[in-house]
Amino acid sequence: MNSKIIEQFNLLEKQVDAEYLNSKVENDLKEETMNRFRLKSIKKALSILKNLDFEITDANDVKGIPGIGAGTIKRIKEILETGKLHDLKDKFSPEKQKQIEGIQELENVIGIGSSTAKKLISQYGIRSVDDLKKAIETGKVKVSTSIMLGLKYYGIVQRDIPRKEITAIEKLLSKEAHKIDPDLEIIICGSYRRGKKTSGDIDVLMYHPKMKTSKEMLHPEKFDLEPYFNLYIDRLTEKGFLIDDITFNPNKKYMGFCKYKLNPVRRIDIRFIPYNSLAPAMLYFTGPMELNTKMRSAAKKRKMILNEYGLFKTDKNGAQIPLDTKSEADIFHALGMDYLTPQQRELYSSGKIH
């Protein structure tokens, strides 16, 4: 459905992404900022177009949908009338295009974000993954452990994880948690919880009803409790499920790589959450980002603060008073919003619900 429109917008996204990367190479901050916003807008419009449940026969069919602006409507009109976008053209020389593709490589390395890629380019003249490996070998540049692991698994880690595989991993993770303590529970959040068919990584929350606050969680021995999180990470490592650590913050957070049976290596994050923060943490880590942003804005308008730890009311002295939020629905209602199920939140990201 709408395949021609989606095809042209996919090509436009690639072109603007190339322009964005080129502005980084040229160290043109003004162009970089402009292209970053252009890219974000096109990505949003493309996501909405891919999730429409009707055929567009007139550009005005999508008028009024959040995320679809006048520029998008104009482009759709052009595609419907001519079959293509005239914005699309070869903007760079073969040499420049090769350089841009090298930077795209860098940003595909786990641990390298936009700012790090820009630093590698501007300060060290690194233009590709091969350049980076050589620079590390010769001692020209030093990088973090997470980037070293990203290079180790570059081309090996696959990010499109089928839902069926995550469901099997969820059963394994839950089973291993219950072996440590029957009340130790896990929830896989992110796009998986929103019902998507594939996910980029595995985002796990863990909780125990007796560990209500960070005090019990970080210092379990003081409350006659077991160090559940550390025991859990050790157990998954011994079983060969966790194969490499990016970071391990005892009693709190693990980031690393996992492998389930004969499936490819995957990225996984496991966070231990205080039980009193379970609802806001589930809300935050389920996403999508657009909804989180809207809800934080709604909280701010009500002189509240919303984050993954809770919903707080600020008193006249500036102190943050936590509100009673036993469920995600409590948070929606406290902000004057209708409750959205995790599946509805995925529709929110595509513009079908707002």
UniProtKB/Swiss-Prot annotation:
Function according to Swiss-Prot or TrEMBL: Repair polymerase.
Protein name, entry field: Probable DNA polymerase family X
Any Pfam family matching the protein: DNA_pol_lambd_f
Recorded GO CC terms: virion component
Cited InterPro entries: DNA-dir_DNA_pol_X, DNA_pol-X_BS, DNA_pol_b-like_N, DNA_pol_B_palm_palm, DNA_pol_lambd_fingers_domain, DNA_pol_lamdba_lyase_dom_sf, DNA_Pol_thumb_sf, DNA_pol_X
Reaction equation(s) it catalyzes: DNA(n) + a 2'-deoxyribonucleoside 5'-triphosphate = DNA(n+1) + diphosphate
Domain of life: Viruses
